[in-house]
Amino acid sequence: MSAVYDIHTHDFPEVPGTSIVQLTPARYCLYPDHVYSVGLHPWDIEDDWRVQMAKVAVIAMHPHVLAIGEAGLDKKKSPVPMDVQKAVFREHVKLSEMLHKPLIVHCVKAVDELLAIRREMGVKHPWVLHGYRGGPEQAEQLRKQGIYVSLGLEYNTDTLLDMPFKYLLLESDTHGDVNVLYKLVSEDMEANEQSVRSLVAKNIVAFLKSHDEHSFE
């Protein structure tokens, strides 16, 4: 597998295998040499969500699918009732635990509900909360609960600078070229860009393997 520098994107990278590309039940072209996650976004849940999730479960078993998601809870933009969002999210959690693949989480104004589900289901494997914009205190509390955060273009600089190096994860999401993000992060860290790329690639490998054993500090 190539070094992965982008833990979550909706676009195919120029160099196959360097980004984890989001697949959905409606978009699941598995091109060779790329790596993927698959999930049902809370904005896209339909009345027949069980059929949608059945497709997710099949795609998730492919060896090039390295993670489950993005999936989660959204109190702001999703028109789907929260009880349905929770039911769908629990199905993703079950898949993550069963297949031993980490979960990429979308969460908007629902952190308490997210943590409650993690506790009630006795989750053993780590999650990553993608597109994190919050402060360093909340990021630390999430880590203690077994949830990494990944930073996109709208990251909080205080969170970046406070974060232990071994937890730094970056993503382009829907914002195109991840190299722009690496340039900004390297400048804020006053670090060599290639060193930051190597660090994040190492951290992504550790995250993907962390279903075996991981301790959060």
Where are these regions (language model features)?
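Mid-domain alpha/beta scaffold segments of enzyme catalytic cores
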Residues: 1-217
